[in-house]
Amino acid sequence: MLSPKKTRFRRQHRGRMKGLSSRGNQICFGKYGLQALEPAWITSRQIEAGRRAMTRNARRGGKIWVRIFPDKPVTIRPAETRMGSGKGSPEFWVSVVKPGRILYEMDGVTKNVAKRAIGIAASKMPIRTQFIFSEIK
């Protein structure tokens, strides 16, 4: 599972997911991509599940780039705990995704193979996504 090696602070505020993604919304590395259409927190487990699904479906050949990284810790308090006594301990890591963000990119395979592999990865995501492709490469 993906997680940062070292962080400045152990806990973070939840924050808001306002507006569209201003960075990471263009295809940069591959020819095909999976683009988010809704805002969400995507966990490191979901990212890994999508990556595995794409790798299995692309079979041999093809290169995959994961364009998001889970750098936000999510804390959870133990069950049946009274209020107070500080914030809970970090349990898992999430990536904050806004609409327009590219989640995965792929190259080295045909369009229909990429569409099938990315479609299976999309079903692992908790949000609506779309398959996009670059005309340039």
UniProtKB/Swiss-Prot annotation:
Gene3D superfamilies referenced in this protein's UniProt entry, alphabetically: Ribosomal protein L10e/L16 (3.90.1170.10)
Keyword Phosphoprotein: no
GO cellular component: mitochondrial large ribosomal subunit; plastid
Compositionally biased intervals (Basic residues): 1-17
Record's subcellular location: Plastid
TM regions (residue ranges): none
Molecular-function GO terms, alphabetical: rRNA binding; structural constituent of ribosome
Annotated stretches, region: Disordered: 1-21
CDD domains (UniProt xref): Ribosomal_L16_L10e
Keyword set, alphabetical order: Plastid, Ribonucleoprotein, Ribosomal protein
Residues in coiled coil: none
Pfam families: Ribosomal_L16
GO biological process terms, semicolon-separated: mitochondrial translation
PANTHER family to which the protein is assigned, alphabetical: 50S/60S RIBOSOMAL PROTEIN L16, LARGE RIBOSOMAL SUBUNIT PROTEIN UL16M
Subunit (UniProt): Part of the 50S ribosomal subunit.
Family: Belongs to the universal ribosomal protein uL16 family.
Annotated NCBIfam families: rplP_bact
Name of this chain's protein: Large ribosomal subunit protein uL16c
Source organism of this protein record: Cuscuta obtusiflora (Peruvian dodder)
Organism lineage string: Eukaryota, Viridiplantae, Streptophyta, Embryophyta, Tracheophyta
